[in-house]
Amino acid sequence: MQLTPHEQERLLIHVAADVAEKRRARGLRLNHPEAVALITSHLLEGARDGRTVAELMVSGRTLLTRDDVMEGIPEMLHDVQVEATFPDGTKLVTVHDPIV
C-alpha cells in the first residue's frame, strides 16, 4: 500500500484514537496524546460525514470530561486544531478548551 505522508498522518491519528477509545472503554484515563487523537479523529470523521465547522466546534467539546483524562490534561490542552476535508473543501477546525 502506497500512502502519502498526509495519508500516513491521518491513519496514525485514527489508530491512536482507536487505542484511546479502547482504553477509555476499559476505564483507563487518557493521556495527552490519546485525548488529542480522539478529538482529532472525531473532527476528521465529522467533516467526512458532511457536518459543518460550527457543529464540529461544539461537538468536539462534548467528547471528553475531566473524569476521562489524567490529572492536569485539561489545563494542558487549550485548543485542538485540524485541517479537515469537507464536501466543499479543506477547512481549519478549532476546538477551544475541548475538555470540560
Curated annotation (Swiss-Prot):
Known pathway: Nitrogen metabolism; urea degradation; CO(2) and NH(3) from urea (urease route): step 1/1
EC number from the UniProt entry: 3.5.1.5
Top enzyme class: hydrolase
GO cellular component terms listed in the entry, alphabetical order: cytoplasm
Sorted UniProt keywords: Cytoplasm, Hydrolase
Stored InterPro entries: Urease_gamma (IPR012010), Urease_gamma/gamma-beta_su (IPR002026), Urease_gamma_sf (IPR036463), Urease_subunit (IPR050069)
Chemical reaction(s) catalysed: urea + 2 H2O + H(+) = hydrogencarbonate + 2 NH4(+)
Gene Ontology biological-process entries: urea catabolic process
Protein name per Swiss-Prot or TrEMBL: Urease subunit gamma
Taxonomic source organism: Streptomyces griseus subsp. griseus (strain JCM 4626 / CBS 651.72 / NBRC 13350 / KCC S-0626 / ISP 5235)
The gene coding this protein: ureA
